[in-house]
């Protein structure tokens, strides 16, 4: 199926690219000003931009006929899905950049852009211009923890904690719904994962965690050295009893890592109220930031260990890099990733306030109530929803159409795409995941009606 694009969006991108070409003219010029050849190049690009702007305005009558877009960035296709579609992809929704983050990328996209004013003690979290040092303090206060560091994704937060606390052969408690990166972090540190089984509702409980700790102690003769549990897991986005599990961890004297990959940045998170020793979040999943980005926050009790500085001394040069943090490999996010986090932060703080998160969950439940009206469409995640990410089952509805359709499961993708909806797993009509985070009520209602319209088209029963 050939996807046609909105010409106004296409020309908007072309105008943006032409502006970047103008920017390159200035970058290549002398500090004293443009040469005559550079002035001509500038005027040519300005004329090109005016043409695009006129076309964008003219195409506004009826929004223009959709057409195939062949624009390229070198060999790369231009990504326009966020401008052209309602995107319900399960892991992209809350990583969508704010306008401020996109602007920050324009200004700070160069490699070591954070290092313009790096002075002693030569460490990322000590840089004051731009305000990276202050941002680290803001992160810690926002999460109600004592110290925080930015890291290249939540996985690097898991890795840093495991590296600091886990020795070869140590047991680490994780959920039976844990993300693979939690496994890898433990494995790299030489530890062994021990999974807390989920119950019939696909939930991880405090009692089950306590039982697992006892099982580990009985079989190994030692307590686990770390407990890592997701607040909302990636498979179902079910809410797990992190408060109760944190209490169990405290009772046994085991450090507790709160995995907030699906909460930090969209929902209220108070690390000390939870009882967490570590809070890990994902910038590119939930904080409207460029990948890879994330946050690791901890208490003063554990900061000296997880943020320890190097003691290594060169045997020939006698060099020592004492300010560099071992688990973080020194500096972490040295460019546009970090600046996008900083630029998005005010919006992220606002959107994660309780009333805003509650509204997002209401929209998720509204859509799913309409979705469930199609007989045979079910929600596999806990119901009613407490999150915007949801696992659904359409085996008894849209999959019945797929069984006889010449396009098989791809018919569903075709129908959704034709309605301006994208992000479901193309070809999947049995079990799959979606995320409504960030959609307006208008888009939520449009999305709901689109699913019902497809059901009507194929004579699927609707309650």
UniProtKB/Swiss-Prot annotation:
Species assigned in the record: Methanocella arvoryzae (strain DSM 22066 / NBRC 105507 / MRE50)
EC top class named in words: transferase
Family: Belongs to the SepCysS family.
GO molecular function terms noted in the UniProt entry: Sep-tRNA:Cys-tRNA synthase activity
In-chain residues carrying the UniProt-annotated modification N6-(pyridoxal phosphate)lysine: 285
Cofactor: pyridoxal 5'-phosphate
Listed InterPro entries: Aminotrans_V_dom (IPR000192), PyrdxlP-dep_Trfase (IPR015424), PyrdxlP-dep_Trfase_major (IPR015421), PyrdxlP-dep_Trfase_small (IPR015422), Sep_Cys-tRNA_synth_arc (IPR013375)
Disulfide bonds: none
HAMAP family: Sep_Cys_tRNA_synth
A Pfam family matched in the record: Aminotran_5
Keywords, ordered alphabetically: Protein biosynthesis, Pyridoxal phosphate, Transferase
Its biological purpose: Converts O-phospho-L-seryl-tRNA(Cys) (Sep-tRNA(Cys)) to L-cysteinyl-tRNA(Cys) (Cys-tRNA(Cys)).
Coiled coil stretches, renumbered: none
Domain of life: Archaea
Reaction equation(s) it catalyzes: O-phospho-L-seryl-tRNA(Cys) + hydrogen sulfide + H(+) = L-cysteinyl-tRNA(Cys) + phosphate
Listed GO biological process terms: translation
Subunit structure: Homodimer. Interacts with SepRS.
Residues binding pyridoxal 5'-phosphate: 154-155, 259, 282-284
EC number: 2.5.1.73
Protein name: O-phospho-L-seryl-tRNA:Cys-tRNA synthase 2
Alphabetical list of NCBIfam families matching this protein: PRK09331.1 (NF006810), SepCysS (TIGR02539)
């Amino acid at each position: 199926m050939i996807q046609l694009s909105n010409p106004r969006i296409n020309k908007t991108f072309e105008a943006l690219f032409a502006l970047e070409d103008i920017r390159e003219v200035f970058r290549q010029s002398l500090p004293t000003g443009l040469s005559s050849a550079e002035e001509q190049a500038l005027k040519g690009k300005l004329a090109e931009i005016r043409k695009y702007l006129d076309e964008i305005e003219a195409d506004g009558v009826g929004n223009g006929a959709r057409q195939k877009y062949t624009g390229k960035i070198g060999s790369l296709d231009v990504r326009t899905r966020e401008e052209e579609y309602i995107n319900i992809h399960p892991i992209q929704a809350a990583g969508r950049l704010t306008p401020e983050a996109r602007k920050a990328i324009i200004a700070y996209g160069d490699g070591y852009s954070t290092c313009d004013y790096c002075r002693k003690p030569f460490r990322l979290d000590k840089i004051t211009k731009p305000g990276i040092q202050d941002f680290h303090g803001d992160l810690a206060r926002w999460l109600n923890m004592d110290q925080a560091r930015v890291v290249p994704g939540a996985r690097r937060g898991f890795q840093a904690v495991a590296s600091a606390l886990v020795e070869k052969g140590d047991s680490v408690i994780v959920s039976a719904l844990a993300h693979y990166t939690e496994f890898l972090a433990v494995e790299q540190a030489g530890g062994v994962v021990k999974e807390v089984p989920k119950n019939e509702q696909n939930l991880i409980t405090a009692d089950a965690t306590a039982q697992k700790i006892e099982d580990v102690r009985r079989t190994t003769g030692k307590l686990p050295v770390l407990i890592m549990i997701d607040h909302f897991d990636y498979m179902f986005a079910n809410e797990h009893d992190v408060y109760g599990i944190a209490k169990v961890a405290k009772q046994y004297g085991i450090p507790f890592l709160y995995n907030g990959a699906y909460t930090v940045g969209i929902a209220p998170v108070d690390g000390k109220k939870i009882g967490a020793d570590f809070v890990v979040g994902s910038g590119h999943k939930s904080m409207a930031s460029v990948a890879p980005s994330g946050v690791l926050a901890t208490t003063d009790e554990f900061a000296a260990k997880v943020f320890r500085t190097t003691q290594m001394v060169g045997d020939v040069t006698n060099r020592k890099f004492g300010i560099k943090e071992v688990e973080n490999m020194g500096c972490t996010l040295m460019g546009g990733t970090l600046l996008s986090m900083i630029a998005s932060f005010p919006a992220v703080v606002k959107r994660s306030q309780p009333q805003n998160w509650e509204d997002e969950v209401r929209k998720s439940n509204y859509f799913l109530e309409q979705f469930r009206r199609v007989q045979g469409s079910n929600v596999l995640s806990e119901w009613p929803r407490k999150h915007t990410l949801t696992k659904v089952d359409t085996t008894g509805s849209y999959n019945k159409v797929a069984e006889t359709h010449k396009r098989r499961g791809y018919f569903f993708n075709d129908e959704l795409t034709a309605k301006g909806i994208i992000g479901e797993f193309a070809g999947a009509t049995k079990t799959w995941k979606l995320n409504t985070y960030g959609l307006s009520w208008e888009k939520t209602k449009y999305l709901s009606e689109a699913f019902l319209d497809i059901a009507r088209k194929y004579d699927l029963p609707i309650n």
